[in-house]
Amino acid sequence: MISSLQSVQNTAARIVTVTKKFDHITPVLIQLHWLPVHFRILFEVLLLVYKALNGMAPLYIMELLSYCTCSRSLCSTDQKLLAVPKSRLKTYGDRAFSVAAPKLWNELTLDFRCLDKIGLFKKHLKTNLFKKAFNV
């Protein structure tokens, strides 16, 4: 499914920039500053997590996420880590928002997790994902 969406995005990029069909698409996506579909999905999931943690998402999404609580003194609560529920199924269970979203959130650096303005979060997240996608 993602490869089909990526093909559509590539075609749209070629139409917008009037690029030939057999030219490499990566420079075109970089020029347009478009994230590949896989990274765009990560962006949207992490943005939804940010909104949920800051009270800007629907209640049913906010209820899927909870901060990690640790009884040991070594775990610091100021890390803003989310609890990752265990899933029984590796293929579909790990793809559920309630499992995948906390994993992605916990992979972010503390700098990202502590941003208080949504505009800053979106800007820094897109820049970070863009660098990862294109090794820039």
Give residue spans per PLM region:
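Hydrophobic/basic alpha-helical segments
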Residues: 1-136
